[in-house]
Amino acid sequence: MIVYHGSTEIIKKPDVIHSKKYLDFGKGFYITTFEDQAKRWAVRKGMRQEKAAIVNVYELSEKWDGFRVLSFEKENDKWLDFVCACRKGQSLNKEYDIIIGNVADDDVFKTVDMYFRGLWDKEKVLGELRYYKMNNQICIANQETLDRLVVFKESYEVVNSDK
């Protein structure tokens, strides 16, 4: 399957070591099946770092037998607790090779943050989340899995039309 990663660099040899720790699914290499989402990620990173926005395109093998996969089909209490724990820095992803689920992007995380800070309960947050258009993310949580399943295809620069 073709997947995408938004960046400010051409990443022919992706790695986990450069990942930030406090992400939705913890430390890992994040990809998506939505090209437009990767473009938005790239543009956002490019604007913050004052660099070119680059989308890297990869082939992700779908031969996942033998890998430890955690898949969140939708936002539910397990997804919410997992994302909040990882965003606090807990290393829950070490139990898995691949984690799949929806993105707690800026808009979604504003809602999740209400739960994170104890202002809303789970039911309120999950009820609000159904109004958001969600995108997916795939976190490859360790280097061995990344090396075995992900192959670089190409990269291209995204022109930010907001400039």
Predicted segments, located by residue:
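ADP-ribose/NAD+-binding catalytic cleft of ART/PARP-like enzymes
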Residues: M1-D24, N56, L60-E62
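Pocket-edge structural micro-motifs
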Residues: H5-T8, T33, N142
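Short, charged/polar surface micro-motifs in flexible loops or helix N-caps
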Residues: I10, E35-A38, E62-G66
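Extended catalytic/binding region for NAD+/ADP-ribose chemistry, centered on the ART fold
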Residues: K20-K45
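Conserved NAD+-utilizing ADP-ribose enzyme module
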Residues: L23-D24, R44-K163
